Amino acid sequence: RAAVSRDFVVGARINGNDFVEGGNDLAACTEIAKYLEPYVDYFNVSCGVYASAPTMIEPCYSPEGWRKNLAKTIKAAVNVPVIAVNTIKHPETAERFLQEGVSDFVGMSRMQLADPDVVKKAMAGREDLIRKCLGCMNCNKSVVAGKNLHCAINPVTGRATVYGDENLVKTGAGRTVAVVGGGPGGMQAALLLKKRGYYPVIFESRDHLGGSAVLASKAPCKGMVAELIETMKAEMKEYHIEVRLNTPA
């Protein structure tokens, strides 16, 4: 703190619980926050260490907002703003936690990977178009492997200089392209084609979109897959993409 001026913002990322035997629990982490408070302008509260990795970067079976008590407890003990990550996947959950005093700001890192426009869409009342993080850990897997950051449901993540909307080469000129299959891959292909100026037509032999992902969404802890299907169906309507159900290609 002494190395910078008072108007230079200094924050601290701290745990609310290490979730390992012999580590810092919530009480200890709260005391650490109180000790650091005079030296920082805000706290960013997370939890877990590598020995308790599923609490640090939660997979699909972790309930949304499961650790809210950690940030709320620390927030009540200090007088500087608290940012909290909380496995937030829905804008209304983020807003509710703000109203409940869980934190002053909400961190939604993986949601930003899944859909960088999540806040813009929420403000416009278009939650139906928000692609919500599945908790599939694909992003973490790519980083651990030393590769570029990628997202299973947003092919633009890590490739924006090529596939970002502003960089797409629009050479379609209205030409019709048949897309065989209305699963997530088919719908994503149709969406990209539409943005490039083509006229995609999805041919789906079944009476619904979603492909094998519909079955996958029935498995335990896979409810977010069902939400992804509904979001992509909404995208098909938003971009006026023609869909022919019960029509084998």
Where are these regions (language model features)?
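Flavin-dependent oxidoreductase catalytic cores
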Residues: 1-180, 184, 188-200, 208
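Beta1-alpha1 glycine-rich phosphate/pyrophosphate-binding loop at the start
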Residues: 178-246
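Phosphate-bearing ligand-interacting subdomains
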Residues: 249
